[in-house]
Every structure is written in structure tokens, then in C-alpha cells.
């Protein structure tokens, strides 16, 4: 079972027939189970409750990554045997991880440049850690993507954009704080005018909302060494 521990932002939920389903909802439809924080009245949303309920997806949005206080994830309940400062546990040709970050953006008109930039930065800045980054995946609705030039007159509403991009980063729990901080740095340092997003009324805005969700696994996740960015000096 995978438990979401930190949610710096939310993933857009589908609205109507042309909406984009959230990545968490899609994972839930594949059989993934999540523990959703249950914030009772009088409890600060910045406090992670001890008890949680099981649900299919995040029920309410949190603050975006670039706003609001940061909440650190708690350590997992299991403690696999491994060296704290060395590479993740290995099982033959496989490398073991226990923490996963999901980085997603919605309505990005810069195609995959944003997540590609994040991946390149992590490869360089976290070279002394063994991590794994997936390629960018995309989810889209059934609405038509292309329209004739000038088909929408001034003042008319353009169709809602329907693209969601996400990538996943796997790391060792003891390195999660460094990965979390580096994600924050690279996302906040992006140039606003390089990426654009389309709002529901069809207008372009020089910003792309980026959301980061952190998960910890109750069981080890194994990847083949060929798919891992091994730490510098690791054999």
C-alpha cells in the first residue's frame, strides 16, 4: 500500500465530459489505495493527523507549491536494513526505493519543457544520490485539440484545455528531504515567461501551476539498475 504523506498542491479533477481526471483518480481506478488526511474542525491543515481514512483520491485542494507553509512527511513504519549514507538497498541487478514524488502540471502550453527541466536539474544536483525519474506521461480528454485559425471571435469562450502532464521521482527515504527541497528550488526558479497556461476563459497566463505529491511505500519498490540514476562512484 502506498500512503500520500505530503501534498503541496492538488491535481485538477475532471469537470463535465471534457474535464481532465486527476492522476490520483486514475491511479485509484487501477487499484491503488490511498490514505487521505482527515482534518477535523479546530485542527490546523498544516498538521498531519495521526488517523486517516482510506479513499480513492484527494478530496479537497491544498495550497500550491509556491505558497503556504511546507509540511514534511513522517518516516515510514518499516525500517529496512541498509546503510544511511550509501546507495539504496540492492537485490541483485535491482535497486530498492521506498519514497515516490509525483510532479504534475496542468494546461501547460510549453509541452514537456517544464518536467524535462526538472529531470535534468535533479540529475545534476542530486548526482551523489541514487534516484529514478520516469519520463513525462500525459492524460487528456476527448475534446478536439485543433481549431481553425480565427474560429473563436473576440469575447467568445475557447474550449477548456484538457492536458495534464506528470512525472515520478523515486528515492531513498533518508534522501527525501533533499529531493523535496531541490524540487522546490527548481520549480520556483523557472522563468515565468517561458511557460504559459490557458485558463478556463481561454486567456493565456505567464505561469504554469506545478503540484508535488509525496508518497511512502509500506513495501520496497525495486527497479532494475539500468533504469536508475546511480550515485556518483556507485558500482
UniProtKB/Swiss-Prot annotation:
Keywords: Host nucleus, Phosphoprotein. Phosphorylated. Belongs to the alphaherpesvirinae HHV-1 UL3 family. Residues 38-89, 138-157 are annotated as: Disordered. The keyword Oxidoreductase does not apply. Its main location: host cell. Residues 38-50 have a biased composition (Polar residues). This is Nuclear phosphoprotein UL3. Pfam families: Herpes_UL3 (PF03369). It is found in: Host nucleus. It comes from Human herpesvirus 1 (strain F) (HHV-1). One of its GO terms (cellular component) is host cell nucleus.
Amino acid at each position: 500500500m502506498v500512503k500520500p504523506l505530503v501534498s503541496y498542491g492538488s491535481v485538477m479533477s475532471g469537470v463535465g465530459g471534457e474535464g481532465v481526471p486527476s492522476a490520483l483518480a486514475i491511479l485509484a481506478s487501477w487499484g491503488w489505495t490511498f490514505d487521505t488526511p482527515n482534518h477535523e474542525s479546530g485542527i490546523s491543515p498544516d498538521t498531519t493527523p495521526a488517523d486517516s481514512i482510506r479513499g480513492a483520491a484527494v478530496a479537497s485542494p491544498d495550497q500550491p507549491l509556491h505558497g503556504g507553509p511546507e509540511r514534511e512527511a513522517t518516516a515510514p513504519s518499516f525500517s529496512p536494513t541498509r546503510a544511511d549514507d550509501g546507495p539504496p538497498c540492492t537485490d541483485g541487478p535491482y535497486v530498492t526505493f521506498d519514497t515516490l514524488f509525483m510532479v504534475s502540471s496542468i494546461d501547460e502550453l510549453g509541452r514537456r519543457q517544464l518536467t524535462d527541466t526538472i529531470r535534468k536539474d535533479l540529475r545534476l544536483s542530486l548526482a551523489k544520490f541514487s534516484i529514478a525519474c520516469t519520463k513525462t506521461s500525459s492524460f487528456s480528454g476527448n475534446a478536439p485539440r485543433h481549431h481553425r485559425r480565427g474560429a473563436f471571435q473576440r469575447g467568445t469562450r475557447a474550449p477548456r484545455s484538457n492536458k495534464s502532464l506528470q512525472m515520478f521521482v523515486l528515492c531513498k527515504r533518508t534522501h527525501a528531504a533533499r529531493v523535496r527541497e531541490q524540487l522546490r528550488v527548481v520549480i520556483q526558479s523557472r522563468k515565468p515567461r517561458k511557460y504559459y497556461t490557458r485558463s478556463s476563459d481561454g486567456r493565456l497566463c505567464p505561469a504554469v501551476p506545478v503540484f508535488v505529491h509525496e508518497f511512502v511505500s509500506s513495501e520496497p519498490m525495486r527497479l532494475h539498475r539500468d533504469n536508475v540514476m546511480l550515485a556518483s562512484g556507485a558500482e
